[in-house]
Protein backbone atom coordinates (compact mmCIF):
# COMPACT_ATOMS: atom_id res chain seq x y z
CA UNK A 1 0.00 0.00 0.00
CA UNK A 2 1.01 3.65 -0.08
CA UNK A 3 1.76 6.18 2.61
CA UNK A 4 2.69 9.84 2.70
CA UNK A 5 5.30 9.08 5.36
CA UNK A 6 6.91 5.90 6.64
CA UNK A 7 8.42 6.21 10.11
CA UNK A 8 11.08 3.67 11.02
CA UNK A 9 11.31 2.98 14.73
CA UNK A 10 8.72 2.80 17.49
CA UNK A 11 10.53 4.68 20.24
CA UNK A 12 9.35 7.97 21.66
CA UNK A 13 10.65 10.00 18.70
CA UNK A 14 9.19 7.71 16.05
CA UNK A 15 5.85 7.39 17.83
CA UNK A 16 5.54 11.15 18.37
CA UNK A 17 6.50 11.78 14.75
CA UNK A 18 3.80 9.37 13.57
CA UNK A 19 1.29 10.90 15.97
CA UNK A 20 1.81 14.51 14.94
CA UNK A 21 1.89 13.66 11.22
CA UNK A 22 -1.33 11.64 11.53
CA UNK A 23 -2.98 14.48 13.42
CA UNK A 24 -1.88 16.79 10.58
CA UNK A 25 -3.77 14.58 8.11
CA UNK A 26 -0.87 12.60 6.67
CA UNK A 27 -1.17 8.91 5.83
CA UNK A 28 1.49 7.45 8.14
CA UNK A 29 2.90 3.97 8.58
CA UNK A 30 5.22 3.29 11.51
CA UNK A 31 7.44 0.20 11.29
CA UNK A 32 8.99 -1.19 14.48
CA UNK A 33 11.39 -4.15 14.48
CA UNK A 34 10.09 -5.41 17.83
CA UNK A 35 7.45 -3.90 20.03
CA UNK A 36 6.64 -0.25 20.63
CA UNK A 37 9.05 1.22 23.22
CA UNK A 38 10.86 -2.11 23.39
CA UNK A 39 14.34 -0.61 23.22
CA UNK A 40 15.87 2.53 24.74
CA UNK A 41 12.61 4.46 24.97
CA UNK A 42 11.39 2.09 27.68
CA UNK A 43 14.64 2.24 29.62
CA UNK A 44 15.32 5.95 30.02
CA UNK A 45 14.44 8.04 33.05
CA UNK A 46 11.58 9.81 31.30
CA UNK A 47 12.77 13.29 32.20
CA UNK A 48 11.09 16.19 30.49
CA UNK A 49 13.59 18.69 31.82
CA UNK A 50 14.61 22.23 31.14
CA UNK A 51 17.44 22.20 33.68
CA UNK A 52 20.95 21.95 32.32
CA UNK A 53 19.89 22.37 28.71
CA UNK A 54 21.75 24.39 26.13
CA UNK A 55 20.20 27.88 26.29
CA UNK A 56 18.80 27.47 22.77
CA UNK A 57 16.95 24.31 23.85
CA UNK A 58 15.17 25.88 26.83
CA UNK A 59 12.21 27.30 24.84
CA UNK A 60 11.83 23.94 23.07
CA UNK A 61 11.66 22.14 26.40
CA UNK A 62 9.11 24.62 27.75
CA UNK A 63 6.94 23.79 24.74
CA UNK A 64 7.63 20.08 25.28
CA UNK A 65 6.16 20.33 28.77
CA UNK A 66 2.97 21.82 27.35
CA UNK A 67 2.81 19.11 24.70
CA UNK A 68 3.32 16.33 27.28
CA UNK A 69 0.50 17.71 29.46
CA UNK A 70 -1.80 17.76 26.42
CA UNK A 71 -0.78 14.24 25.40
CA UNK A 72 -1.33 12.92 28.93
CA UNK A 73 -4.88 14.25 28.79
CA UNK A 74 -5.51 12.36 25.52
CA UNK A 75 -4.38 8.94 26.76
CA UNK A 76 -6.62 6.28 28.23
CA UNK A 77 -4.01 5.38 30.87
CA UNK A 78 -1.97 7.11 33.54
CA UNK A 79 1.42 7.72 31.90
CA UNK A 80 2.97 8.71 35.21
CA UNK A 81 3.35 12.35 34.25
CA UNK A 82 4.51 14.22 37.34
CA UNK A 83 5.98 17.62 37.98
CA UNK A 84 8.42 16.67 40.72
CA UNK A 85 11.37 18.74 39.60
CA UNK A 86 14.96 17.80 38.86
CA UNK A 87 17.93 18.32 41.15
CA UNK A 88 21.59 18.17 40.18
CA UNK A 89 24.08 17.84 43.02
CA UNK A 90 27.46 19.54 43.04
CA UNK A 91 30.40 17.80 44.65
CA UNK A 92 32.86 20.63 44.01
CA UNK A 93 32.80 24.40 44.04
CA UNK A 94 33.65 24.29 40.31
CA UNK A 95 30.40 22.41 39.66
CA UNK A 96 28.51 24.98 41.73
CA UNK A 97 30.04 27.75 39.62
CA UNK A 98 28.91 25.98 36.45
CA UNK A 99 25.38 25.76 37.86
CA UNK A 100 25.46 29.48 38.77
CA UNK A 101 26.47 30.30 35.21
CA UNK A 102 23.66 28.16 33.79
CA UNK A 103 21.20 29.79 36.20
CA UNK A 104 21.66 33.07 34.31
CA UNK A 105 20.22 31.34 31.21
CA UNK A 106 17.36 29.97 33.30
CA UNK A 107 16.53 33.45 34.59
CA UNK A 108 16.50 34.81 31.03
CA UNK A 109 13.77 32.25 30.24
CA UNK A 110 11.81 32.79 33.47
CA UNK A 111 12.51 29.29 34.77
CA UNK A 112 11.99 28.54 38.44
CA UNK A 113 15.50 27.08 38.84
CA UNK A 114 17.30 27.89 42.06
CA UNK A 115 20.65 27.22 43.66
CA UNK A 116 20.80 25.04 46.76
CA UNK A 117 23.31 25.10 49.56
CA UNK A 118 24.39 21.80 51.12
CA UNK A 119 21.76 22.40 53.82
CA UNK A 120 19.18 23.20 51.13
CA UNK A 121 19.91 19.89 49.39
CA UNK A 122 19.47 18.03 52.70
CA UNK A 123 16.19 19.85 53.33
CA UNK A 124 14.85 19.07 49.84
CA UNK A 125 16.18 15.49 49.81
CA UNK A 126 16.34 14.41 53.46
CA UNK A 127 17.48 10.86 52.66
CA UNK A 128 20.35 11.90 50.39
CA UNK A 129 23.63 10.10 51.04
CA UNK A 130 27.19 11.17 50.31
CA UNK A 131 28.91 14.51 50.34
CA UNK A 132 27.91 17.52 48.29
CA UNK A 133 28.51 21.24 48.46
CA UNK A 134 25.11 22.18 47.05
CA UNK A 135 23.17 21.86 43.85
CA UNK A 136 20.58 23.32 41.54
CA UNK A 137 16.87 22.51 41.47
CA UNK A 138 14.16 23.21 38.90
CA UNK A 139 10.75 22.45 40.47
CA UNK A 140 8.82 22.71 37.18
CA UNK A 141 10.73 19.89 35.48
CA UNK A 142 8.68 16.80 34.76
CA UNK A 143 8.91 13.06 34.31
CA UNK A 144 6.75 10.43 32.62
CA UNK A 145 6.96 6.63 32.81
CA UNK A 146 8.41 5.81 29.37
CA UNK A 147 7.36 2.15 29.25
CA UNK A 148 3.74 3.28 29.75
CA UNK A 149 3.81 6.65 27.98
CA UNK A 150 5.21 5.58 24.60
CA UNK A 151 2.68 2.74 24.00
CA UNK A 152 -0.10 5.11 25.13
CA UNK A 153 1.09 7.68 22.59
CA UNK A 154 1.15 4.95 19.94
CA UNK A 155 -2.51 4.26 20.74
CA UNK A 156 -3.30 7.95 20.21
CA UNK A 157 -1.40 7.84 16.90
CA UNK A 158 -3.40 4.80 15.80
CA UNK A 159 -6.66 6.53 16.74
CA UNK A 160 -5.49 9.51 14.65
CA UNK A 161 -5.06 7.18 11.66
CA UNK A 162 -1.45 6.03 11.80
CA UNK A 163 -0.89 2.40 10.91
CA UNK A 164 1.53 0.86 13.40
CA UNK A 165 3.25 -2.38 12.47
CA UNK A 166 5.30 -4.16 15.10
CA UNK A 167 7.76 -7.03 14.54
CA UNK A 168 8.66 -5.59 11.14
CA UNK A 169 12.36 -4.83 10.81
CA UNK A 170 13.44 -2.53 7.99
CA UNK A 171 16.53 -4.02 6.36
CA UNK A 172 16.98 -1.69 3.38
CA UNK A 173 15.54 1.35 1.65
CA UNK A 174 14.95 1.36 -2.10
CA UNK A 175 14.97 4.91 -3.40
CA UNK A 176 14.22 6.26 -6.85
CA UNK A 177 14.83 9.87 -7.88
CA UNK A 178 15.63 10.82 -4.29
CA UNK A 179 12.45 9.30 -2.90
What do these predicted regions represent?
Residues 94, 125-133, 174-179:
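A short, glycine/Asx- and small/polar-enriched loop/turn
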Residues 18, 22, 156:
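Gly/Ala-rich phosphate-binding loop of Rossmann-like dinucleotide-binding domains
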Residues 24, 109, 160:
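Conserved dinucleotide-binding and phosphotransfer motif residues
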Residues 32, 117-118, 166-168:
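Short loop/edge segments at beta-strand edges and connector loops
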Residues 45-124:
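Dinucleotide-binding Rossmann-like beta1-alpha1 core, especially the glycine-rich loop
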Residues 22-42:
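Glycine-rich FAD pyrophosphate-binding loop
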Residues 1-13, 29:
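Beta1/beta-strand and adjacent pyrophosphate-binding region of the FAD-binding site
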Residues 136-179:
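Helical element adjacent to the flavin cofactor pocket in flavoenzyme catalytic cores
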